[in-house]
Amino acid sequence: MIQLYNSLTNKKEPFVPIVPGKVSMYVCGPTVYNYIHVGNARPAIAFDTVRRYLTYRGYEVKYVLNFTDVDDKIIRTANELGEDTETLTNRYIEAYLADTGALNVQPADVHPRVTDTMEEIIEFIRQLETEGFAYESEGDVYFRTKKFETYGKLSQQSIEDLRAGSRVDVGEKKEDPLDFVLWKAAKPDEPSWDSPWGKGRPGWHIECSAMAKKHLGTTIDIHAGGHDLKFPHHENEIAQSEACNHAKFANYWLHNGFINIENEKMSKSLGNFLLVHEALKEVDPMVLRFFMLSVHYRHPINYSRELIEQAANGWSRIKEAYQNIEYRLSVTAGLGEASESMERKLESIKASFIESMDDDINTANAVTVLFDLAREANIYAKADHVAKATLEQVLSLFDELTGVLGLTLAEEKELLDAEIDQLIQERNDARAARNFARADEIRDLLKEQNIQLEDTAQGVRWKRL
């Protein structure tokens, strides 16, 4: 059975969805005012992998990841660039989908935007006001935190301790330092919407509560996001949602660890970030994904050139093993007798993979299992007697397990040296038979694979570009 580490209880728990066989999952997406950096890609990859594994285990997953497309940073950036917020956010939403798509992150089933959810947000706040959990103050609306008695349960903090660390400045409009804004009164030259409290726009926390409810209902199976969102964002989501809906908001809370540079969190505010599209100019997308999966999603990762090179070498080992099996399959004639011992090893490897992923989506252990598969594949590829059926089983298991992790092998295939030599011999034979069309076809095929041919007096020489 799948066990997930629930941040709400701080322990691993058996995963039991609300509706048998179905999973509702909400992930806090980006505020779209800039390109995403490598740290932003961590939750995208981590929770895409959770979704993939749940699907692999037979669940029907409805996956929602939002775009925050109205925010102080968005407004400020749009003003600096002299463009409207819609143009800005559309550009960065497209960029987000392109960058995460390059990392083989599947699009969500629903990508809601705040600006498309305004009616539901306003109704949500109105309901909180009716219940006595919200109050209006000079056009702003705040959540009355002291009325929600279990506030702090996600971050394991008491209201008293939180209040002791807060203060209300003179002239501030809140009743309590812990109260947070649900609706902001309109300011000149900012996007605004009509509401019962006058023109304005929503606060950040209420947006996710409303979008989750609209697309997944009052109680969802899994809510996920970065560790930095646990407090106050997720804490406030719980307070709003449970106060409004009189129901538990989410049964499982998953939080991914940070990506650090020089042991400090990668972030735009610190200026120590690396944009994904810049990183991918130097790092293969599958290597970057493999790098992140090599560490458990809850643990921090230190990003460095040395560790990226280690990930590249590890991914290369797995690819080469896959290609060795492909080549042996291509030159193996006849059916042959299937290897029972190899098939037993494959069954054991698959069982170990599932055991690792059942344990709170432990991709670090799952990657170790891939190395076990690569080792056994290399041994079998060199065996004197092999069977096509067994070779095909090895390839199938590679595709199955890497597919669960969102890693692609077949699409990245490079020609092996032996395959290149074989094609060159075929080209030589075609030229000798004056079949120049076929010879040119082979030359073009090799060129597409970045293989350059040079005809010399001693024969054809080739090199990789």
UniProtKB/Swiss-Prot annotation:
- Intervals of motif 'HIGH' region: 30-40
Tell me the SMART domains matching this sequence.
Answer: DALR_2
Cofactor annotation comment: Binds 1 zinc ion per subunit.
A biological process (GO) of this protein is:
cysteinyl-tRNA aminoacylation
GO cellular component terms?
cytosol
Q: What is its EC number?
A: 6.1.1.16
Question: One GO molecular function term?
Answer: zinc ion binding
Q: Which SUPFAM superfamilies match?
A: Anticodon-binding domain of a subclass of class I aminoacyl-tRNA synthetases (SSF47323), Nucleotidylyl transferase (SSF52374)
Catalytic class of the enzyme: ligase
- Write out the catalysed reaction: tRNA(Cys) + L-cysteine + ATP = L-cysteinyl-tRNA(Cys) + AMP + diphosphate
Where is Zn(2+) annotated to bind? C28, C208, H233, E237
Q: Which residues bind ATP?
A: K268
Locus of motif 'KMSKS' region:
265-269
Task: Show the disulfide pairing.
Answer: none
| Coiled coil region boundaries | none
> Origin, by domain of life?
Bacteria
Q: Where in the cell is it found?
A: Cytoplasm
The entry's keywords: Aminoacyl-tRNA synthetase, ATP-binding, Cytoplasm, Ligase, Metal-binding, Nucleotide-binding, Protein biosynthesis, Zinc
Q: Which family does it belong to?
A: Belongs to the class-I aminoacyl-tRNA synthetase family.
- Name listed for the protein in its UniProt record: Cysteine--tRNA ligase
Q: What organism does the UniProt record list as the source?
A: Exiguobacterium sp. (strain ATCC BAA-1283 / AT1b)
